[in-house]
Design a protein with these regions (language model features):
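N-terminal signal peptide c-region/cleavage motif recognized by signal peptidases
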Residues: 19-23
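N-terminal export leaders
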Residues: 4-9
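Short, conserved sequence motifs used for protein processing/export or organelle targeting and
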Residues: 81-105, 113-244
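Active-site-proximal cofactor/substrate-binding loop regions of enzyme domains
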Residues: 2, 27-96
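Sec-dependent N-terminal signal peptides
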Residues: 10-16
């Protein structure tokens, strides 16, 4: 028999959980978006097909697609204007975490757990489907001007994680004048502008506010809650850049 007192306690517990004050059970979480990171370069002739695929993924509601341009192709005749040493370092960290022998482009990393050649669509889609079945933390993200507010609920028996802020441009178009893609007009979607750690999640309910000039009105923002910095992504949220 359900008593009125029991019912009120249940309602209060549910309200507290929604507010983030009650830790989630270890297996309890939402089915949020899957994070796909493409490591690419405008100097790589194998990358345009992967760039096009990422642009398609960027239009999906169940995927957070991010394009990380690496700098180790720059010596081949064309300096990718969006390449960043930090992006190459992030890819190398994944290499070590996943036990890979080398870094390469185009590479897609899915939820920080698995990887595939970026232009092999079927392989990447299988990884996305598998990732979508895993429970994940429901991450809240609100932006006002150059300030964001991030909320992450608590979870029992959780390992510490880094909260990353990734700022990205919607689309960049570049006429490549040298290198393997000389003469091509390269279209890159969700090009990463900056990546920065903005906090740590220790398993307890978290709310943090962060302000950065990088959060310009014409850029998008993604927040990744990721174990060990470049380990499995536990949850993520995104604010899309404007369409015009």
């Amino acid at each position: 028999m359900v008593t009125r007192r029991h019912l009120l306690r249940s309602i209060a517990a549910a309200a507290a959980l929604a507010a983030g004050s009650v830790p989630l059970a270890a297996g309890a979480a939402d089915r949020g978006p899957v994070v796909v990171e493409l490591f690419t370069s405008q100097g790589c002739s194998s990358c345009p097909a992967a760039d096009k695929f990422l642009a398609e993924l960027a239009g999906r509601g169940d995927v957070i697609a991010l394009s990380f341009h690496v700098d180790y192709w720059n010596y081949m005749g064309w300096t990718d204007p969006f390449s960043r040493a930090d992006n190459s370092a992030r890819q190398r960290a994944y290499k070590h975490a996943m036990g890979l022998r080398y870094v390469y482009t185009p590479q897609m990393v899915v939820d920080g757990r698995s990887q595939a050649i970026g232009n092999e669509r079927e392989a990447v889609e299988r990884l996305i489907e598998a990732a979508a079945e895993r429970p994940r933390l429901p991450v809240g993200l609100v932006q006002k001007g150059t300030t964001i507010t991030v909320t992450v609920p608590g979870r029992e028996d959780a390992e510490p994680a880094v909260v990353w802020l990734v700022v990205f441009d919607r689309t960049q178009v570049t006429k490549v004048e040298r290198g393997e893609n000389s003469g091509r007009s390269m279209v890159n979607a969700h090009v990463v502008h900056s990546v920065m750690p903005i906090g740590k999640w220790l398993g307890q309910p978290l709310q943090l506010t962060y302000t950065s000039d990088a959060l310009a009105a014409n850029r998008g923002a993604a927040v990744l809650v990721q174990k060990k910095g470049t380990g499995p992504i536990l949850g993520a949220a995104m604010i899309r850049p404007p369409t015009s």
